């Protein structure tokens, strides 16, 4: 016996739905709220969570399987359907073991519009697997919310087509905002388990970029589904099946099955290291280099010294002028951080930093928090890798910085100063104003998305002019 339920999320680019199927044994499904509460303890008190693992060994770990983010890579969704059928009806010891130890979250097809249209992109023409740090598309926002809610221990993203089948982890350069030593410790062994299951069941071979290649398949960019999930503590893998026919479905199915068995049997030790990721951030502990015993398994330089990050004490985000050109964009940035499970605080009183006085209500992102890596990825300007020679990237890193992209000012606080703050769950919505009295014209600066939207609304029914030179009015 086992239980499952299906939920749908609608409002996608082309009007179709996403379907999430959740499977486990009946006892687990009756206590879903309890298990989700346990996941929250990992973030609120990681040390208490570690103690709970010592006391109870009946906890379940969530595993997220993501089918066909690229619509024309059909095998991923087909393999997801086959996995659902097995997990729902099969009574073999392996299946029952997996259901007893895990909660399976299966997003059947991440890009239903692309699947119907036969396209890699969604109905808006976006490659959804380049969107996770911007989240411009509804499909991305939906899946990002699920990942942030569940903090899955493992995420498997099903793609095609590479020969032989490709199973991550990746080549360098590794993004320094991960806790890569903890990630690779389990991701590599899990990949080897997938490779072994694939070979045993199908005779197909696989490549593991971390072991088999010097470069060219890196996890530096945070835009991909597994890389985004890594900021939430997941052991994330992209799987690229080799064949477009039924053999490709077989390969995905058995590789995933190998991962499910591995995670089920090693969940206690794996969850400890997932919690350790959060504990390091929570206590502002230093990162660690990839251990020598792992480096010795590959012939290729992992640029280990570049896997470490110097985190600031905090980021200051002014809420209004003069420190912030656009309060709307500041609020947008703050809400984006909160939506992605990054903790944001508000100053309870004014404070001075580097000669500037910031008023009460200024936003502060303290970096001693469980998901500091994601916070820093969003807020940091990044590293200049121009001088790095002899290394090829899968997609040459573009500059990503949400503050720079959206025109929101933020200030780095290298060392902590004492500021009384309170955690918030939403930015204060900016309120505009309009001068009263007789006027021939109104003027405003187009310095936010809201301002451009207002300009477009005006153009629908009236005249709008753009100043060709600087001017002053009433001072």
What function would you assign to each model-found segment?
Residues 128-155:
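Catalytic-core regions of hydrolytic enzymes
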Residues 107, 114-121, 155-171, 236:
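Core alpha/beta catalytic barrel or barrel-like domain that forms the active/cofactor pocket
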Residues 1-74, 88-90, 95-100, 130, ...:
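Intrinsic-disorder/low-complexity accessory segments
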Residues 51, 107-108, 113, 139, ...:
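Structured alpha-helical segments in the cores of large, soluble enzyme domains
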Residues 75-77, 89, 95-137:
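Mobile, glycine- and charge-enriched loop segments
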Residues 127, 157, 240:
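Acidic active-site catalytic centers that drive phospho-/nucleotidyl reactions
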Residues 81-83:
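Amphipathic alpha-helical scaffolding segments
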Residues 79, 135-141, 219-222, 329, ...:
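Short, glycine/acidic-rich beta->alpha junctions
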């Amino acid at each position: 016996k086992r239980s499952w339920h299906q939920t749908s999320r609608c409002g996608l680019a082309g009007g179709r739905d996403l379907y999430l199927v959740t499977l486990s044994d009946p006892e687990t499904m009756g206590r879903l709220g309890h298990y989700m509460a346990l996941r929250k303890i990992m973030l609120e008190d990681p040390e208490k969570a570690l103690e709970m693992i010592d006391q109870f060994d009946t906890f379940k770990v969530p595993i997220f399987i993501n089918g066909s983010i690229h619509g024309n890579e059909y095998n991923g969704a087909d393999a997801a359907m086959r996995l659902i059928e097995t997990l729902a009806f099969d009574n073999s010891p392996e299946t029952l073991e997996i259901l007893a130890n895990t909660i399976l979250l299966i997003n059947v097809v991440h890009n239903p519009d692309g699947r119907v249209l036969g396209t890699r992109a969604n109905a808006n023409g976006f490659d959804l697997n380049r969107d996770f740090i911007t989240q411009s598309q509804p499909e991305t926002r939906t899946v990002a919310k699920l990942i942030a809610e569940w903090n899955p221990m493992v995420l498997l993203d099903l793609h095609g087509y590479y020969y032989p089948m490709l199973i991550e982890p990746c080549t360098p350069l590794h993004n320094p905002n991960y806790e890569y030593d903890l990630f690779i410790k389990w991701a590599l062994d899990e990949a080897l388990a997938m490779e072994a299951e694939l070979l045993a069941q199908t005779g197909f071979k696989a490549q593991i970029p971390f072991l088999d290649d010097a470069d060219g398949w890196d996890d530096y960019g945070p835009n991909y589904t597994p890389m985004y999930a890594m900021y939430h503590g997941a052991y994330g893998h992209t799987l690229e099946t080799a064949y477009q026919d039924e053999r490709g479905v077989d390969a995905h199915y058995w590789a995933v099955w190998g991962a499910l068995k591995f995670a089920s049997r090693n969940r206690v030790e794996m969850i400890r290291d997932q919690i350790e990721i959060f504990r390091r951030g929570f206590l502002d502990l230093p990162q660690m280099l990839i251990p020598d015993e792992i480096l010795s398994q590959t012939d290729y330089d992992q640029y280990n010294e570049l896997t470490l990050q110097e985190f600031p004490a905090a980021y200051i985000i002014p809420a209004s002028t003069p420190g912030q050109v656009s309060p709307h964009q500041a609020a947008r940035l703050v809400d984006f951080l909160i939506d992605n499970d990054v903790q944001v605080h508000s100053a309870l009183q004014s404070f001075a930093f580097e000669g500037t006085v910031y008023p009460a209500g200024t936003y502060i992102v303290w970096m001693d928090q469980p998901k500091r890596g994601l916070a820093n990825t969003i807020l940091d300007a990044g590293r200049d890798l121009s001088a790095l020679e002899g290394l090829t990237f899968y997609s040459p890193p573009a500059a990503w910085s949400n503050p720079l992209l959206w025109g929101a000012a933020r200030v780095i606080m290298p060392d902590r100063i004492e500021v009384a703050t309170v955690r918030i769950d939403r930015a204060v919505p900016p309120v505009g104003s309009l001068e009263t009295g007789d006027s021939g014209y109104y003027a405003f600066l187009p310095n936010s998305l809201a301002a451009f939207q207002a300009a477009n609304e005006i153009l629908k029914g009236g005249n709008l002019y753009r100043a060709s030179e600087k001017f002053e009015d009433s001072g």
